[in-house]
Regions:
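Short beta-strand segments that buttress and anchor functional surface loops
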Residues: 1-4, 151
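Active-site substrate-recognition segment that forms the wall
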Residues: 10-13, 17-142
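A structured beta-alpha segment of the ubiquitous adenosine-cofactor-binding alpha/beta core
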Residues: 3-11
Length: 177
């Protein structure tokens, strides 16, 4: 049974295998299983611009954009929503949203898309599970039946399907079906 702070009724579950894919929580789970995975939370910021008027909806691009020099990306989520993301911050497990990290995102939209109204922008911050070499941990752990698919960092959505296929192939090769 899960509550707002995790398990409220611990129970033992028997399984042939387990895949640890718990984002920044993977480090602690790996340690409990005898593995060391050097995942560190890297906070990423974004804004969702609610495109509440016709001019904003027409001005916002439908294709994803990447402004490499300033490390900002944008993606149209729906006819009335635009996501703009960028910046990275090493600050432990802190989820606080800093205005000085959001301001460059809003400023970028105003500069690059001057007809988009940013007054309804909603800020967000999340912790990206990063490894020092920026490569996800995809493979078996020390214990039999323990596998990892974690540490995708800022490329989580980009790599998720490919690493899921990879870990599936590894598991099916090692565990009886």
């Amino acid at each position: 049974e899960l509550g707002p702070h995790g398990d409220t009724k611990p129970e033992q579950i028997t399984a042939d295998g387990v895949v640890i894919c718990a984002g920044v929580g993977s480090r602690a789970l790996a340690a409990m299983l005898g593995d060391r995975i050097n995942i560190y939370p890297v906070k990423g910021y974004s804004i969702t611009v609610n495109l509440d008027d016709d001019a904003s909806q027409q001005a916002a691009p439908w294709v994803s954009l990447m402004d490499d020099p300033v490390k900002i990306v944008s993606s149209r989520l729906a006819p009335d929503r635009l996501r703009v993301a960028g910046t990275a911050e090493f600050n432990g497990y802190n989820y606080d949203i800093r205005a000085d990290r959001i301001e460059p995102l809003v400023t970028w939209v105003r500069r690059e898309m001057p007809r988009v109204n940013t007054s309804a922008a909603v800020p967000w911050a999340g912790l990206r599970p990063m490894l020092p070499d920026l490569m996800p941990k995809v493979g078996a752990g020390k214990r039999s039946g323990v596998f990892y698919n974690t540490g995708h960092g800022h490329l989580g959505w980009t790599l998720a399907a490919a690493t899921a296929e990879t870990i599936t192939a590894i598991i099916t090769a090692r565990l009886p079906v």
